[in-house]
């Protein structure tokens, strides 16, 4: 499972410059990391900022394992089935996703890796928060006719509205390993150990992952799924990871049908790149 990691995603237009662009940006600390929102029109910033802050605040209250009154803490002593049955409607999909990924990965990803009496959803909480924020902004945007917006939480991104170009930073720190576009509703997440060694743990052993993987980047139709997949695919590595993705293809509980639209980029310590990218999303 995953601890807080350094940020590796930077919007490409912030690096390349924004000549003639009216992009507005706002950032603030939340959920143990940094959140930021970007809007292409100045007048849209209050709407995207309000929707995002409300969603992130809600998730912080619901899934804080250090808060004895949070839903996560209240449910942690129940069985996995009872957790799903008793979870609030707003977060049930969060638990279902965690337990499904745990089952398909053979326990490599496990929200109970700290012990049977502890639920830890840190590996997907950021993605869940991003999905809520994007849905909230899109709903408000329809009534207010608001424009394009991109939401970032700790380096995980979701296009709340419109299309955005971004890139995953090279481990050598000299530019981008790849660039790609995010279309409306799509998200990208990365799990990495570039600077401080691995802070991602294999729940099967309880040890930090040491499998030659430097980072995994996942583009998916949900930020929560991108978050979960980037973590489990880092743990599993390319060979086991591809086997996991084949299982996901056949899994009826996967909410988006076949997983053909999931794009994955592994960057290895050897310098090699391994991809699962049927639609050619990553550009090198």
Spell out what each predicted region is.
Residues 2-284:
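Mature catalytic core of soluble alpha/beta enzymes
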């Amino acid at each position: 499972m995953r601890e807080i990691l350094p940020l590796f995603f930077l919007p490409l237009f912030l690096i390349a410059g924004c000549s003639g662009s009216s992009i507005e940006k706002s950032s603030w600390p939340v959920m143990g990391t940094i959140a930021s929102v970007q809007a292409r029109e100045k007048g849209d910033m209050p709407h995207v900022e309000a929707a995002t802050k409300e969603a992130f605040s809600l998730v912080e209250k619901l899934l804080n394992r250090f808060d004895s009154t949070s839903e996560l803490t209240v449910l942690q002593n129940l069985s996995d089935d009872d957790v799903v049955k008793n979870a609030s409607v707003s977060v049930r999909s969060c638990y279902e996703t965690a337990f499904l990924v745990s089952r398909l990965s053979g326990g490599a990803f496990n929200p109970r890796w700290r012990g049977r009496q502890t639920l830890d959803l840190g590996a997907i909480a950021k993605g869940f928060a991003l999905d809520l924020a994007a849905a909230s902004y899109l709903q408000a945007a329809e009534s207010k006719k608001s424009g394009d917006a991109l939401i970032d939480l700790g380096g995980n991104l979701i296009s709340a509205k419109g299309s955005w170009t971004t890139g995953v930073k090279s481990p050598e720190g000299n530019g981008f390993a790849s660039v790609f576009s995010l279309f409306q509703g799509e998200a990208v997440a990365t799990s990495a150990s570039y600077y401080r060694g691995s802070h991602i743990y294999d729940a099967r052993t309880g040890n930090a992952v040491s499998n030659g993987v430097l980072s995994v980047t996942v583009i998916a139709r949900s930020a929560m799924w991108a978050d979960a997949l980037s973590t489990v695919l880092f743990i599993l590595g390319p060979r086991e990871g591809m086997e996991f993705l084949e299982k996901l293809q056949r899994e009826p509980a996967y909410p988006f049908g076949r997983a053909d639209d999931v794009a994955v980029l592994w960057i290895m310590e050897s310098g090699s790149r391994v991809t699962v990218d049927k639609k050619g999303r990553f550009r090198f």
